[in-house]
């Protein structure tokens, strides 16, 4: 990764442009504001797009490092949400019994 030969950005530059464009759309703004109560932060997508283009045009090592760090941060953010339910190893022992509302009838 130090010399950058053969290295490709994690996503094509067009993907960064599409994400930035989506982030700036009115529909995404309204959805994000409704769900999170704040404006969506689109600056990172714009920085990633600029870094990707800088890498493709000049093979800039700083742009490469910026893209790598940004993608790592995205992966960490996606992994930080834990499971709500613990996976079961086996079904409950009374799984075959009728449900409580079926007993009343």
From Swiss-Prot:
<comment type="similarity">
    <text>Belongs to the UPF0545 family.</text>
</comment>
<dbReference type="GO" id="GO:0043083">
    <property type="term" value="C:synaptic cleft"/>
</dbReference>
<keyword id="KW-0770">Synapse</keyword>
<dbReference type="GO" id="GO:1900272">
    <property type="term" value="P:negative regulation of long-term synaptic potentiation"/>
</dbReference>
<comment type="subunit">
    <text>Interacts with RTN4 isoform A/Nogo-A; the interaction results in enhanced RTN4-mediated inhibition of AMPA receptor clustering. Also interacts with NCAM1, RANBP2 and CCT8.</text>
</comment>
<dbReference type="InterPro" id="IPR021475">
    <property type="entry name" value="Pants/Emi1-like"/>
</dbReference>
<dbReference type="GO" id="GO:0045202">
    <property type="term" value="C:synapse"/>
</dbReference>
<dbReference type="Pfam" id="PF11326">
    <property type="entry name" value="PANTS-like"/>
</dbReference>
<comment type="function">
    <text>Negatively regulates long-term potentiation and modulates adult synaptic plasticity. Stabilizes the interaction of RTN4 isoform A/Nogo-A with its receptors, inhibiting clustering of postsynaptic AMPA receptors at synaptic sites. Upon neuronal stimulation, degraded at synapses, reducing RTN4 signaling and allowing AMPA receptor clustering at individual synapses.</text>
</comment>
<dbReference type="GO" id="GO:0005739">
    <property type="term" value="C:mitochondrion"/>
</dbReference>
<protein>
    <recommendedName>
        <fullName>Synaptic plasticity regulator PANTS</fullName>
    </recommendedName>
</protein>
<dbReference type="GO" id="GO:0048167">
    <property type="term" value="P:regulation of synaptic plasticity"/>
</dbReference>
<keyword id="KW-0964">Secreted</keyword>
């Amino acid at each position: 990764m130090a010399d950058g030969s053969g290295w490709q950005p994690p996503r094509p530059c067009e993907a960064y442009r599409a994400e930035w464009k989506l982030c700036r759309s009115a529909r995404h703004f309204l959805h994000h504001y409704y769900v999170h109560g704040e404006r969506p932060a689109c600056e990172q997508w714009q920085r990633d797009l600029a870094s990707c283009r800088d890498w493709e045009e000049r093979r800039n090592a700083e742009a490469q490092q910026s893209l790598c760090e940004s993608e790592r941060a995205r992966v960490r953010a996606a992994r930080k949400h834990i499971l709500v339910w613990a996976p079961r190893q086996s079904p409950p022992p009374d799984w075959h019994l009728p449900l409580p509302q079926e007993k009343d009838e």
